[in-house]
Amino acid sequence: MNPRLACSTWLPLLLVLFTLDQGRANPVERGQEYRSLSKRFDDDSTELILEPRASEENGPPYQPLVPRASDENVPPAYVPLVPRASDENVPPPPLQMPLIPRASEQKGPPFNPPPFVDYEPRAANENALRKLIKRSFERSPGRNKRLSPGDGCFGQKIDRIGAVSGMGCNSVSSQGKK
C-alpha cells in the first residue's frame, strides 16, 4: 500500500471527525448549556436523595447512611497521659481517663550471651580467615597472566594481533625500510 495514498485518505477523514461533535471526548450539543462537572454531580446527587425509591414508598422514613454525631459518639477531650511538671501552678486536668504510671528507672541486668562449646576469640578466627584468603589468592589459576599482561602496551592477545597485522606497539615494519 502506498503511504502517500494512506495519508491522503486518512488525514481528511480525521480532520472531519475531530471538527464534528462525535470526535470530542465530551461533546456538547449545540444550544445546550454547559454546566461544570461539580455542579452536575451536585444536581444528580440531590435528585437521588430527594426522589423516593419504589421500595421506600411504603417503608420507614428516609434516614441518612452516615450517622450524625450525638453526645454518645463524641470522643472525650484530650487529656495528657502523664502530667507535665514544668508549671506547678496549673491545675491538674480533669480525670476522665486514668493516668498511666511511669516506668521504673531501674535497668535490668546486662545481656550476656551463653558460652559456646569450642569458642575461640574473634581475633583468632579473623587471622585464620586472612591466611586462608591469602593462600587461595596466591594459588589462583591465571593470576600471573592477569597481573603481568605482557611486554606490549595492551594485553597479550591484542599485542599478538598487532604484531601479525603490523599495527601493534612491538611490531617492526619492514615495508617502509628498503
From Swiss-Prot:
Location of the protein in the cell: Secreted
Keywords: Bradykinin receptor impairing toxin, Cleavage on pair of basic residues, Disulfide bond, G-protein coupled receptor impairing toxin, Hypotensive agent, Secreted, Signal, Toxin, Vasoactive
One BP term from GO: cGMP biosynthetic process
GO cellular component entries: cytoplasm; extracellular space
Gene Ontology molecular function terms on file: hormone activity; hormone receptor binding; toxin activity
Region (Disordered): 69-107, 135-155
PANTHER family: ATRIAL NATRIURETIC FACTOR PRECURSOR, NATRIURETIC PEPTIDES B
Function (record text): Helokinestatins antagonize the vasodilatory actions of bradykinin at the B2 bradykinin receptor (BDKRB2), with helokinestatin-1 being the most potent antagonist.
Family to which the UniProt record says this protein belongs: In the C-terminal section; belongs to the natriuretic peptide family.
Name the UniProt record assigns to this protein: Natriuretic and helokinestatin peptides
Organism: Heloderma suspectum cinctum
